[in-house]
Structures are given as C-alpha cells and as structure tokens.
C-alpha cells in the first residue's frame, strides 16, 4: 500500500480559516511536521488545496517517528573512532593513591 508523505513547509499564519481547517484535517499543526496519509482522492484533494504550503512525496511504507527524525538530521561532520576512557581511569587511580 502506498502513502502520501506530507510535510508542512510554510506556516498558515494570516491565511483563511478554510486553509487552516484543511491543514488541521491533515493533522499538520507545526512547521516541518510530517504525516502519512493513504493514497485516495479525498486526501489528494486536501493536499491540492494547500499545495503551496506543503511538500509531498509517495512512499511504500510509513516511518516511525524516531526514524523520521534521524532521516532529517544532518551529519555531525566527524566520527568517533575510539574513546580514551581507560587512560582516564588509570590517571584517576594514580592521583587517588
């Protein structure tokens, strides 16, 4: 089964109550929030009404909230290869005795 992955890109501040009610019916309340909707004509019509505010893609399966957050996160720019915990323990033992 396919799903629409809908992400709210722009805020509904200052827009008509009709647009805000459509966003509410799609369960989009905050910017950059993501919802998954079934692919059907009703949801397609709702998305079409707010097409200027959202980004839409079709996916095969829903992602969990944690997976969604990880996919949006940027890389840190470095990787930790080794931690120097054993050396610190030895230093602490030397100063304690």
UniProtKB/Swiss-Prot annotation:
Pfam families linked to this entry: Ribosomal_L30 (PF00327)
Keyword Mitochondrion: yes
GO molecular function: structural constituent of ribosome
Location(s) in or outside the cell: Mitochondrion
Gene Ontology CC: one annotated term: mitochondrial large ribosomal subunit
Chain ranges passing through the membrane: none
Annotated keywords: Mitochondrion, Ribonucleoprotein, Ribosomal protein
GO biological process: mitochondrial translation
SUPFAM superfamilies assigned to the protein according to its UniProt record, in alphabetical order: Ribosomal protein L30p/L7e
Keyword Cell membrane: no
Highest taxon above the source species: Eukaryota
PANTHER family: LARGE RIBOSOMAL SUBUNIT PROTEIN UL30M, MITOCHONDRIAL RIBOSOMAL PROTEIN L30
Role played: Component of the mitochondrial ribosome (mitoribosome), a dedicated translation machinery responsible for the synthesis of mitochondrial genome-encoded proteins, including at least some of the essential transmembrane subunits of the mitochondrial respiratory chain. The mitoribosomes are attached to the mitochondrial inner membrane and translation products are cotranslationally integrated into the membrane.
Family membership noted in the UniProt record: Belongs to the universal ribosomal protein uL30 family.
Assembly and oligomerization: Component of the mitochondrial large ribosomal subunit (mt-LSU). Mature yeast 74S mitochondrial ribosomes consist of a small (37S) and a large (54S) subunit. The 37S small subunit contains a 15S ribosomal RNA (15S mt-rRNA) and at least 32 different proteins. The 54S large subunit contains a 21S rRNA (21S mt-rRNA) and at least 45 different proteins.
Name by which UniProt lists this protein: Large ribosomal subunit protein uL30m
Organism annotation: Schizosaccharomyces pombe (strain 972 / ATCC 24843) (Fission yeast)
């Amino acid at each position: 089964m396919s799903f629409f992955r809908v992400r709210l890109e722009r805020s509904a501040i200052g827009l008509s109550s009709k647009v805000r009610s459509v966003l509410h019916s799609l369960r989009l309340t905050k910017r950059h929030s993501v919802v998954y909707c079934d692919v059907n004509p009703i949801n397609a019509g709702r998305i079409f009404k707010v097409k200027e505010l959202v980004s839409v893609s079709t996916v095969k399966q829903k992602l969990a909230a944690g997976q969604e957050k990880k996919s949006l996160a940027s890389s840190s720019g470095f990787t930790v290869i080794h931690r120097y915990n054993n050396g610190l323990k030895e230093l602490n033992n030397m100063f304690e005795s």
